[in-house]
């Protein structure tokens, strides 16, 4: 896949829809829960509005409370006609109209000072520096200059000038540099475009670079879940592919062998050294080996920790044998004596499974042997792959479950809706079997506790699960991270992917 970013059109509907729907995991500046939530509220449709979004979701703007709500919320309400845009003076409208009357950028303060107080570019830049660096002493000096200049210009009264400058002073807590914000917005749009039009490449690259995140494991988990909601499934490492890092192979994303815990360069180097000889001996490439051929013809030539890790993450899947059975037979094979294993290498091609091979090298129980035969014929536990065990092993070795989602280890028969169904617009009552990723408890204005949940299943994730006070009091003991629950509720009309909870059952 190759294209020039400079050739991207900035009116691409698919890209803007992705942003407006909050599907911005991995999108520059907007990938957090906060960014996704406000992207859905702001619904930007051009670079200017996207720049505004980048600026108003910064902590200062979110914490700047005027008339009971943040400046961020004021922007959203005014943009969508919920509240009226009012200006302290008519002269401010040309400067603030594009940002819904909210003083979003430092450059707007500079322009106000130029228009109302006659500041030249240097004086306006001094104001910008005072705002950006929050220099109270410099701001006090500039305020005197501003009031004096405003009087000379005669556009506003002294009282209005003081009120406007007071507003500028308050904006120093949140006003952002517009040139920075525009450049961030362009990068955000580029990444949204890539995600909208080249999703496989997008997810592959972001997984590759997840190591630079504060919590790489959590980053990969979120990317894998987000990819599922777009019908893109990340595959476990595979000995058929032999890729070392995450790569796109046959238009599918595959984790690399080196991304498995307990597998390092030393183990991989030995695998590569011993592989050609074994492929020649077995008579076919590793991609065509059966599990039996791999076990007898190759497993003794590499580290046991490598085999255990590869089997546990599914790197040998597709050979018609469960992972549990592979590990069980590998353990049995390791317990044979060196002489027994050496003899087996000479005759194993006469058989097609470990049990038949063992019968040729060990006598029956009546003959004083058969211990390993009995172990293979009558295992002490089921060798089927239990989803809960697979999830646990993949989380242990990869940091994220790939084959199953965590909730698939539970009884989900009562569920009638998936996360993806909700994302795609399903209405009405819902029953969802999900894993809780996060719980955010808040207090209402009346002092009551309520909460918002982030959840996921095998189809994707949702961040807008609302638990009001009564439900919180009743179910809070089972509402915790990583718990699997059945959520019974209804679609929230105001939010495309919001759910209001009526009941919660632990599953």
Go through the PLM ranges and name each one:
Residues 1-507:
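Noncatalytic, beta-rich nucleic-acid-contacting surfaces in large DNA/RNA-processing enzymes
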